[in-house]
C-alpha cells in the first residue's frame, strides 16, 4: 500500500514539474509588428523565456503584454524599437498614439481595465537594449513580480511618470555608469 502511495506521489510530482517547464525561444523579427505571426497560439502560450532581435514596434509590445500568458523573462537587448503611430499599440482603449523609436512604449506591460492599471503579473525579468532612450508612462506599472530590469545603456534613459511604479525592481546597469542613473530625474 505504501509503495502504491509513493508511486502515485512520485507521478504527481513529476507531472507538476513537467507542467512548469521552462520554454525558451529566440526570434528574429525582420518587420516591425509581425512578431505574433511568427508562432502558433500554443507556442505563445507556453513561452516563459523570450529573446527577441530585429525590429519591434508598439504592436509587438501589445502582443507581448496580452498574448504571452507565461512570459517571465524578456530579452530585447539586441532589438531595435521602431516608430509606430496608430490605434493597435499599447495605449489603453485603442487610443491613437505616436510611439517614438527606441522608446519602451507607454503601457508596454500594463493596461487600464475598469479604471485600474493592471501590470503583467508573470513578468520577472527584462533586459533592455543600449539603444533605449525612454521608458514611457506606466510601461511597467503594476508588474508586481518584476524583480530585475537590466539596462545595457551607459547613460540613463529618460524615465517617465510611473514607468516602474508599484514594483520593487533591482536595476542592473553597466559597470561605471551608476552615477549617470543616480543623478538623472526619477531614477533616485
Predicted regions: what is each one?
Residues 31-38:
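Surface-exposed ligand/attachment interfaces on beta-rich extracellular proteins
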Residues 23-31, 48-56, 71-86, 91-103, ...:
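Structural signature of tandem-repeat unit edges
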Residues 3, 168-188:
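Extracellular/surface-exposed low-complexity segments
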Residues 39-47, 67-68, 164-166:
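Flexible, charged surface loops at secondary-structure boundaries
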Residues 60-62, 100-107:
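Well-ordered, non-membrane alpha-helical segments in soluble/globular domains
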Residues 1-24:
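Bacterial Sec-dependent N-terminal signal peptides
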Residues 38, 46, 57-62:
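Accessory end-domains appended to solenoid repeat scaffolds used in host defense
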Amino acid at each position: 500500500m505504501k509503495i502504491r502511495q509513493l508511486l502515485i506521489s512520485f507521478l504527481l510530482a513529476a507531472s507538476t514539474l513537467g507542467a512548469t517547464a521552462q520554454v525558451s525561444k529566440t526570434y528574429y523579427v525582420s518587420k516591425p509588428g509581425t512578431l505574433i505571426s511568427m508562432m502558433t497560439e500554443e507556442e505563445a502560450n507556453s513561452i516563459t523565456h523570450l529573446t527577441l532581435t530585429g525590429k519591434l514596434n508598439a504592436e509587438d509590445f501589445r502582443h507581448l503584454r496580452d498574448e504571452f500568458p507565461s512570459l517571465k523573462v524578456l530579452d530585447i537587448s539586441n532589438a531595435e524599437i521602431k516608430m509606430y503611430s496608430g490605434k493597435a499599440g499599447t495605449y489603453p482603449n485603442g487610443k491613437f498614439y505616436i510611439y517614438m523609436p527606441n522608446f519602451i512604449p507607454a503601457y508596454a506591460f500594463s493596461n487600464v481595465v475598469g479604471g485600474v492599471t493592471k501590470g503583467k503579473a508573470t513578468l520577472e525579468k527584462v533586459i533592455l537594449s543600449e539603444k533605449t532612450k525612454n521608458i514611457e508612462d506606466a510601461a511597467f506599472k503594476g508588474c508586481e513580480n518584476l524583480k530585475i530590469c537590466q539596462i545595457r545603456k551607459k547613460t540613463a534613459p529618460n524615465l517617465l511618470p510611473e514607468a516602474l511604479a508599484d514594483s520593487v525592481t533591482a536595476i542592473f546597469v553597466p559597470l561605471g555608469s551608476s552615477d549617470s542613473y543616480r543623478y538623472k530625474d526619477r531614477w533616485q
